[in-house]
Amino acid sequence: MKITILSGGTGTPKLIQGFKKIIPNKDISVIVNTGEDTYIGDLYLSPDIDTVIYTFSDIINDETWYGLKEDTFFCHEQLKNYGFNEVLKIGDRDRALKMHKTALLKKGIPLSEIVELEKSSLNITSKIYPMSNDLVQSKILIEENGEKLLLKFHDFWIFRKGNANVLDVFYENSNYAKPADGVLRAIEESDFVVIGPSNPITSIGPILSIKEIKEALKEKIVFAVSPIIGENPVSGPTGTLMSAKGYSVDVTGIYGYYKDIVNVMVIDSKDINKKKEIECDVLCIDTIMKTIEDKVNLSKNIVEYYKSKCTY
């Protein structure tokens, strides 16, 4: 069995930890959001890519879901002494990966090839693909003191901590972006696709904004795991951004966002009363992933549902 997972940097990596326990890692492909990629100074950040790499190599800081566990921060502290305002705290070993990526990008090497080098160096057998080698950026339109501002996601979430009146979200350059090498093949060869419980708007939305990817997904069996329970997003600014795009902040809103491509919605058992409002198959189960047992259980239930009921 081969699966493809669409992932951002939080939520979905927890599910990846479950799948990698029950499916041979070589049969798992992950297409990762790069809509949050940005430069801090001269350092290129691809936060979701790095998080997925660290997740597969079992070195992810699973308290923050960013950076490496037990990392040190000598460089960050020294930069502060020099007056450099590095708001995002980057660890020393994490910085090394980012420096490597930056140096190769400056040489003109595509991001997908760099990711292949990095995962190979960490003995990762799963396939990890950036959604595109073209720069597609999530831009957040906010209103502040009567003025409209267009922010990168980093500026919105890290600098402002999501405290803003959000009017809309755009995916800059997505009309011209092409899927990275291997992305469409991974979708085509997979038995089914899982959209993980990442923020639909800024983690999964940029991937779906690339037309060829979305069209390829329409030909597959697609599960979508809701990142919302009741009216409460599990993490991040999901609620604010869903509202800005005109979707209700609940599982019906998640279904509405994915309805063009989803075959099975995976929702928490607490939302069983919403099942009748969802016009596709529904797998209702505990979706909170606090322990590795939780992650494995959710992954197993998705696989078993596919085996028993998905004969589209």
Swiss-Prot record:
One GO process term, biological-process aspect: F420-0 metabolic process
What are the binding positions for 7,8-didemethyl-8-hydroxy-5-deazariboflavin in this chain?
50, 89
EC nos? 2.7.8.28
The pathway noted for it is: Cofactor biosynthesis; coenzyme F420 biosynthesis
What the entry lists under Gene3D superfamilies is as follows: CofD-like domain, CofD-like domains
Q: Which cofactor does it need?
A: Mg(2+)
Q: Which InterPro entries match?
A: CofD, CofD-like_dom_sf, FbiA/CofD
* Pfam families according to UniProt: CofD
* Reaction(s) catalysed (UniProt annotation): (2S)-lactyl-2-diphospho-5'-guanosine + 7,8-didemethyl-8-hydroxy-5-deazariboflavin = oxidized coenzyme F420-0 + GMP + H(+)
Q: Which domain of life is it from?
A: Archaea
Q: Name one GO molecular function term.
A: LPPG:FO 2-phospho-L-lactate transferase activity
Q: Which CDD domains does this one have?
A: CofD_like
Instruction: Keywords in alphabetical order, please.
Output: Magnesium, Transferase
Q: How does it assemble?
A: Homodimer.
The record's comment on protein family reads: Belongs to the CofD family.
* NCBIfam families registered for this protein in UniProt: F420_cofD
Q: Which PANTHER family match?
A: 2-PHOSPHO-L-LACTATE TRANSFERASE (PTHR43007:SF1)
Q: What does this protein do?
A: Catalyzes the transfer of the 2-phospholactate moiety from (2S)-lactyl-2-diphospho-5'-guanosine to 7,8-didemethyl-8-hydroxy-5-deazariboflavin (FO) with the formation of oxidized coenzyme F420-0 and GMP.
**Protein name per its UniProtKB record:** 2-phospho-L-lactate transferase
Name of the gene this protein is made from? cofD
